[in-house]
């Protein structure tokens, strides 16, 4: 919005020329997201408490979690506001990739909101059924990926980390593959959101990493030099990624141990879906497995646990997802959280290193 209002004035007032620079608008998207979080945060928490939108704690989980009972949830509403407002203010709103990403983030946020509202406000313990959630997740992801491939003409080739000349073309199989990336990322982040600040930290780190890759993907010279896929217009996603980083840090202010508010499904599903569609648009789908390694491990721990118990009658972990396994082994919650953040930073650096290690 500000881009469209103020940049045209650059012809008469040179100061407004700064609005053409992605770096300037990205930095201020981060700052705006932080400001929105700090201004709206206390108000959102009070409203959630008034709605009695309080987290229900599993009785079969770690005993230390019982004291969290009654903490407001659905704080993902604050995250969404802190992403959408800066994006609308600082991004080029004629960019199709910005709107596609917002469509996925808000669509998945609506799924999570509906599930959370049924569970914590209407006291319907079932919420949305797994089938219902999966249906809507697949529908939204399918709509977004079909638009990108069939309308926007996005390449269906894959970029394989560490191999600069390996670009397998999936053709129309790319559509179900892209859907899998978005849905998988969404649910993986959802499974990770089990400790105070555990999910939002890695999400912010992932968003910062994709900020860099979006900027490179949208720059013809940089993408050619680094031999990464060139996606005209993808650079504008750096602004949205900046908003995600700011929103993540701003939410962490309230979600850090001991948490004042939880993000709920409205936050975890939307953030995961956002990371997934960012990976698809920037043509770094496989890189998401590296930078989002914590989310991958969390999801795999649940899959292996369920599979092992179903077919062998034995559990691999004391409890899944794996962060609960470490809790039951006696590792303090804050230590688990910070260690997972550190691992994510290392994985992000490895992901960035693939720009030259080819």
Swiss-Prot record:
Q: What catalytic reaction does the record list? A: UDP-N-acetyl-alpha-D-muramoyl-L-alanyl-gamma-D-glutamyl-meso-2,6-diaminopimeloyl-D-alanyl-D-alanine + di-trans,octa-cis-undecaprenyl phosphate = di-trans,octa-cis-undecaprenyl diphospho-N-acetyl-alpha-D-muramoyl-L-alanyl-D-glutamyl-meso-2,6-diaminopimeloyl-D-alanyl-D-alanine + UMP
Q: What is its main location?
A: membrane
Membrane topology is:
Multi-pass membrane protein
Q: Which pathway is recorded for this entry? A: Cell wall biogenesis; peptidoglycan biosynthesis
Against HAMAP family, the record matches this protein to:
MraY
Give the UniProt family note: Belongs to the glycosyltransferase 4 family. MraY subfamily.
Identification of the protein by name:
Phospho-N-acetylmuramoyl-pentapeptide-transferase
Instruction: Record the organism.
Output: Geobacter sulfurreducens (strain ATCC 51573 / DSM 12127 / PCA)
């Amino acid at each position: 919005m500000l881009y469209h209002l103020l940049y045209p004035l650059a012809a008469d007032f040179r100061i407004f020329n700064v609005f053409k620079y992605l770096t300037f608008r990205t930095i201020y998207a981060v700052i705006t997201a932080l400001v929105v979080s700090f201004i709206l945060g206390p108000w959102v928490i009070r409203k959630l408490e008034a709605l009695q939108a309080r987290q229900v704690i599993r009785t079969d989980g770690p005993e230390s979690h019982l004291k969290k009972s009654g903490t407001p949830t659905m704080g993902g509403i604050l995250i969404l506001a802190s992403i959408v407002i800066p994006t609308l203010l600082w991004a080029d709103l004629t960019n199709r990739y910005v709107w596609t990403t917002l469509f996925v983030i808000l669509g998945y946020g609506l799924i999570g909101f509906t599930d959370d509202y049924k569970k914590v406000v209407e006291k319907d313990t079932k919420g949305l059924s797994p089938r219902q959630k999966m249906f809507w997740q697949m529908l939204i992801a399918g709509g977004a990926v079909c638009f990108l491939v069939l309308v926007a003409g996005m390449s269906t080739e894959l970029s394989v980390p560490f191999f600069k000349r390996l670009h397998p073309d999936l053709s129309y199989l790319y559509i179900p593959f892209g859907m899998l990336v978005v849905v998988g990322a969404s649910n993986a982040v959802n499974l990770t959101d089990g400790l105070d600040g555990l999910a939002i930290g890695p999400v912010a780190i992932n968003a910062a990493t994709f900020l860099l890759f979006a900027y490179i993907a949208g720059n013809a010279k940089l993408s050619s030099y680094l031999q990464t896929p060139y996606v005209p217009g993808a650079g504008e996603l750096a602004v949205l990624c900046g908003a995600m980083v700011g929103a993540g840090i701003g939410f962490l202010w309230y979600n850090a141990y001991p948490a004042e508010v939880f993000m709920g499904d409205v936050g975890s599903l939307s953030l995961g879906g956002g990371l997934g569609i960012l990976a698809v648009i920037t043509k770094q789908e496989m890189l998401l497995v590296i930078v989002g390694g914590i989310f991958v491990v969390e999801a795999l721990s649940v899959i292996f646990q369920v599979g092992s118990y179903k077919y062998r009658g034995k559990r691999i972990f004391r409890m899944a997802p794996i962060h609960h396994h470490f809790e039951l082994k006696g590792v303090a919650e804050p230590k688990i959280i910070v260690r997972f953040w550190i691992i994510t930073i290392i994985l992000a650096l490895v992901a960035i290193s693939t720009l030259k290690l080819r």
